[in-house]
Structures are given as C-alpha cells and as structure tokens.
Amino acid sequence: MTSHPVFIDLSLDEQVQELRKYFKKLGAEISSEKSNKGVEDDLHKIIGVCEVCFKDGEPAQIDGILNSIVSIMITIPLDRGENIVLAYCEKMTKAPNQPLAKVCLQSLWRLFNNLDTASPLRYHVYYHLVQVAKQCDQVLEVFTGVDQLKSQFANCPPSSEQMQKLYRLLHDVTKDTNLELSSKVMIELLGTYTADNACVAREDAMKCIVTALADPNTFLLDPLLSLKPVRFLEGDLIHDLLSIFVSDKLPSYVQFYEDHKEFVNSQGLNHEQNMKKMRLLTFMQLAESYPEMTFDTLTKELQINEDEVEPFVIEVLKTKLVRARLDQANRKVHISSTMHRTFGAPQWEQLRDLLQAWKENLSSVREGLTNVSSAQLDLARSQKLIH
C-alpha cells in the first residue's frame, strides 16, 4: 500500500478551527472555539467526536478530514502524543462499512508512514491498521510476510510481548484466506518463546500445529517438533497427530482418526483433507526407499483404487515435491528424486557423502584435463623441434 506525505496549507490553529466548526455543524458535541489548553487538547476533543463524519459524508470528503487530523497529530511531540494516537487508532476501527473502512485504512497507513521510523507509536498504529485491513479485505496490502514485517520495525523493534500479540492478530486475519502465510506467522510466534516461558504458550502451539496441518501447501512439518512450546505438548493428542504427519504413513493416521475422531473434528481439521495430505506424505516416504513402485503397491499403501493411481501421481508431480515418470504400460511409477519428509542426521550424512563424491569427481575431471593439456603442449613442442 502506498501513502503520500501529509501536507496541509493551513496553519495548525486554522486547521483546528476549521475542524471544530465542521464537526459542530455535523451535530457533534464540541465547541467551535479553540481550547485555551493548546493544540493537544483540541485534538483530544476533535478525535473524540470524529466518528460523526462516518454517518453522511462521502469517502473522499472524509478522507480529507482525516488527513487534516493526521497532519496535526504528527506535529505533537512523542512524549505527549501516545494517548492521542491511540485514541485516533481506536476511532478508525469503528468504520460502519467497507468503503469507509478503506478510508480509515488509508488514514492509518498515512499516519504510520509519517511517524518517525524510530517511534514506538508505529507499533500501535500498525496493530490497529491490521484490524482495519481485515474489515475491508486488504490484509495483504499491509502484510506480505514476516521479513517485511520485521523491516517495518527495524529502527524500533517492539517487545517480545508486543510481537506475540501482533503475530496472534496476523494469524487470526490470515487463517481463512492464506493458510501458508498464517502458518509461517504462527511458527514465528512460537519462536519468540524461550525455555523459561514456553510452558505458557500451549494454546499458541496448538494453533500453530493445526494451521500447519490444515495448510495444503505445507509438507515439511519436522521443524515444528523442535520448537520449545511444541515440546511441552508431548503426550497430548495434538502432538501425537503432528508426529504422524511428520514421519508415519497413512494407516497410522487412519487408526488415529478412528480412535480420536471427535478430537480431530474439534480442532477444525477436515478428515478428507488430512487423508489427501497423508497420502502425499506417504508417497514421498515410499519414494525415498523405492526408485520404482507398482500400481498394486500404491493402491495398497495409499488405500485408493487402481484407476485413481494415475490422477494421484499427476497431482503429486504438480507439487514439485517428487520427480517421477508414469509407466502406464507396465503399471509402474519410476522415481527420479523426492523431498525428504524429515531432515535429520541421516539426511545430513547423505548430503555430505553426495557432496564429497562430487568433489572427488570434479578433482578427477580437473586432473584429467590437466594431463590432456600437458600432453598437447608436449606434442606441440616436439612438432616444433622436428620442423
């Protein structure tokens, strides 16, 4: 979302006077005269009634009024501006409809970008900005990822508690429209806890697991097990379910669902979606061990009919998690490569051995090229001597 700098031609006193007159004309309980306590008191009074412009005003007109308020607000010194900014942010969350919510969003974004990047008030503005963005379906305009979020606060990082609160909000506003982004937010949230306070993050850990399991694009779930808050859930059903998605095959999930159907449903997880994901994860695990699989093996392991094998493999190939070739004539699937479901010590050792083999092969090629080059030079010298 882009925002233009705030610039108003009138003086502060003139702006305050005009705003007071405008809101009084709309029927607000406010004096048209300036306060003798100064511009900060004027702002408190104006912000206190500013929502009256939502009733009948046009969006463009309201945007101009809010822009005028913001232009005054950013002149207030930081040590005296917190209550004013918070009051204004709260008012912006009260827009009665989506078009006006977009106007309020633009106003908050304008305020956010005109505050000093080292101002701690930017956190509070951004928090309310996300709330308003949800009201008008504009969340991705103000939040595109964790890296972008951190860069916004690089000059004045919020406290761990503030970031936890913000991450929870971001998870809430993205979980219905972008599960992948929501899952990343929750993982980032759990990363803010330490060994000392991880035990109090039970609810956050459960939400993180459920979001990751529900996300159709998240398949590498092993990293969740290393998060401290998730470790505190060991022995709970949600942790058992996560462990199945991390390293077990489809039959383990089917048995778990039969034993704990009510629990799975209570978490908001869709059984059919879980089955689809577990089939894909099971296929990946089989592909790690078998470079070639028959259709009969797949129908048994994946609990599908034979006529479903080809469509299933095609869907797997679309994910790019596995590279394979269908052999319809011989009813087989030939595996070229697959992403590992878990990446622990064995996988690191395998990668080390592969890199070592490459190194040795490159050394052999280099040595061979050197020998060929030397032989050609010797031949060239001998031919010169002959002539």
From Swiss-Prot:
GO terms for biological process: formation of cytoplasmic translation initiation complex. Its main location: cytoplasm. Coiled coil: none annotated. PANTHER family: COP9 SIGNALOSOME COMPLEX SUBUNIT 7/DENDRITIC CELL PROTEIN GA17, EUKARYOTIC TRANSLATION INITIATION FACTOR 3 SUBUNIT M. Component of the eukaryotic translation initiation factor 3 (eIF-3) complex. The eIF-3 complex interacts with pix. Component of the eukaryotic translation initiation factor 3 (eIF-3) complex, which is involved in protein synthesis of a specialized repertoire of mRNAs and, together with other initiation factors, stimulates binding of mRNA and methionyl-tRNAi to the 40S ribosome. The eIF-3 complex specifically targets and initiates translation of a subset of mRNAs involved in cell proliferation. Belongs to the eIF-3 subunit M family. This is Eukaryotic translation initiation factor 3 subunit M. The lineage of its organism: Eukaryota, Metazoa, Ecdysozoa, Arthropoda, Hexapoda.
